[in-house]
Swiss-Prot record:
Cofactor field: [4Fe-4S] cluster
Name of the gene: nuoI
Family matches, as HAMAP family: NDH1_NuoI
Coiled-coil segments: none
EC number(s) given by UniProt: 7.1.1.-
Entries under Pfam families matching the protein: Fer4_7 (PF12838)
Annotated InterPro entries: 4Fe4S_Fe-S-bd, 4Fe4S_Fe_S_CS, NADH_quinone_OxRdtase_chainI
GO annotation, biological process: aerobic respiration
Co-factor note (free text): Binds 2 [4Fe-4S] clusters per subunit.
Function: NDH-1 shuttles electrons from NADH, via FMN and iron-sulfur (Fe-S) centers, to quinones in the respiratory chain. The immediate electron acceptor for the enzyme in this species is believed to be ubiquinone. Couples the redox reaction to proton translocation (for every two electrons transferred, four hydrogen ions are translocated across the cytoplasmic membrane), and thus conserves the redox energy in a proton gradient.
Superkingdom of the source species: Bacteria
One GO CC annotation: plasma membrane
Membership in a protein family: Belongs to the complex I 23 kDa subunit family.
Protein's recorded name: NADH-quinone oxidoreductase subunit I
């Protein structure tokens, strides 16, 4: 008898409670500030692509969904010849964003990645590259790291410290 009354109480309590279901197309779900969604490639403040094709993102990816090939520009700047992410394999873990030294890879709160054909989930560089700078608007990797200047060794450019000889520091 007690179990039947308890069951009736639970049914009545849940009958008049508010449902947790969100009617998705009409109501947007609440996304938290650190939500990790679709991956994008950003540009630096000069409008150039930030990615220097260092391959750290592909090396750290646990499911191996990132592929890229490095090439060099005429002024010595590295950039990816192709950059490909297979979103059918991506688990949106964010390790690629953490590993990127240039802040080129950033995760956005966009979560609508469904397609009818799985081949459409392979995004090329043209699909990933956005026009803005993303989360870090003033950062430019080449202003921080510099570029090699033809005819000058390390430490000979303007406002550049000479390289440290680590062998002289050894005991």
């Amino acid at each position: 008898m007690i179990s039947q009354l308890r069951t009736l109480w639970i049914v009545l309590k849940h009958t008049f409670s508010r449902a947790d279901t969100v009617q998705y197309p009409e109501q947007r779900p609440k996304l938290y500030p650190r939500y990790r969604g679709r991956i994008v490639l950003t540009r630096d403040p000069d409008g150039e692509e930030r990615c220097v094709a260092c391959n750290l993102c592909a090396a750290v990816c646990p499911v191996d969904c990132i592929a890229l090939q490095k090439t060099e520009d005429v002024d010595g700047r590295w950039y990816p010849e192709f950059f490909r992410i297979n979103f059918s394999r991506c688990i949106l873990c964010g390790l690629c964003e953490e590993a990127c030294p240039t802040y080129a890879i950033q995760l956005t709160p966009d979560f609508e990645l469904c397609e009818y054909d799985r081949r459409n989930l392979v995004y090329e560089k043209e699909h990933l590259l956005i026009q803005g700078t993303g989360k870090y608007p003033g950062y430019s990797f080449y202003r921080v790291a510099g570029k090699a200047i033809a005819g000058k060794d390390k430490g000979q450019a303007e406002n550049e410290a000479p390289p440290i000889d680590v062998h002289s520091l050894l005991p």
